[in-house]
UniProtKB/Swiss-Prot annotation:
The active site is at 125 (schiff-base intermediate with substrate). Disulfide bonds: none annotated. This is Transaldolase. Pathway: Carbohydrate degradation; pentose phosphate pathway; D-glyceraldehyde 3-phosphate and beta-D-fructose 6-phosphate from D-ribose 5-phosphate and D-xylulose 5-phosphate (non-oxidative stage): step 2/3. The lineage of its organism: Bacteria, Pseudomonadati, Pseudomonadota, Betaproteobacteria, Burkholderiales. InterPro entries: Aldolase_TIM (IPR013785), TAL/FSA (IPR001585), Transaldolase_1 (IPR004730), Transaldolase_AS (IPR018225). One of its GO terms (molecular function) is transaldolase activity. It comes from the Bacteria.
Amino acid sequence: MNQLDALKQFTTVVADTGDFKQLAQFQPQDATTNPSLILKAVQQPEYAPLLQDTVARCKGRTMDDIIDRLLVRFGCEILAIIPGRVSTEVDARLSFDTYASITRAERIIDLYQAEGIDIDRVLIKIAATWEGIKAAEKLEQRGIHTNLTLLFSFAQAVACGQARVQLISPFVGRIYDWHKKQAGAHWDEAAAAGANDPGVRSVTQIYNHYKHFGIATEVMGASFRNLGQITALAGCDLLTIAPELLARLVASAAPLQPALDAEAAKGMALPAVNYDEAGWRYALNEDAMATEKLAEGIRAFAADAVKLEQLILASG
């Protein structure tokens, strides 16, 4: 049995790509997209007709509407291939605007429903800012499920659990990147591998907290740099993995056992943690890595949204 099939026995495997033509070979349950992945996809020749057709159908519409319709087109193509859910992201430039995030999310859901898609098959991705978490809380109350992304800290995860969001995406690889850069020449790759990887440790702490306190929010590890990070999180609720790493899992026959254990977490001696807004903002501020990576991630997704707009203008 290859490692991908082994992983599927105890973790829901999710494909992290906008390139939906790669999905069938890996047979993931769910799929995730983001502005960067969609931008990458529409620049490939095989997806140019989809972009051009969407733009042609949207003459006279606002740029926001065109982008949402393009994201939903990709989402519908993905849902025709996978049995589960697709994550579609709200514009990162709305990350500090609760009301605008809610409005945009509801519009995306309306577009999916117009295509006959059951809304339970769609997760709305929103950056895990305080405003984003509050938007997700309201959306969940309205029956719209959310995926809180750009999550780098325990404080973000706690607030998402309090808000009863459907799913969170802690970014393993970007946490790893930050610590490796900070350590510089002192970084010891072997010592920081597997369960000792800082990104893996972060997801493990969040997973154990959720399971210990009976928090229903799903944990989906994301942003992987190597197979060791993936195998060290086997047993996590979900893992979203890029096609390149999915292919490497298929190519490996190394034994794989669960590394995370929900039942074991229930028996751990863990402190209860809750945040109000002031406490949460202070906790995030105290975490230099999370503060920097959250801001950097929002800027990067926003920049790619601008590039996507430029592509749309050029194709029109």
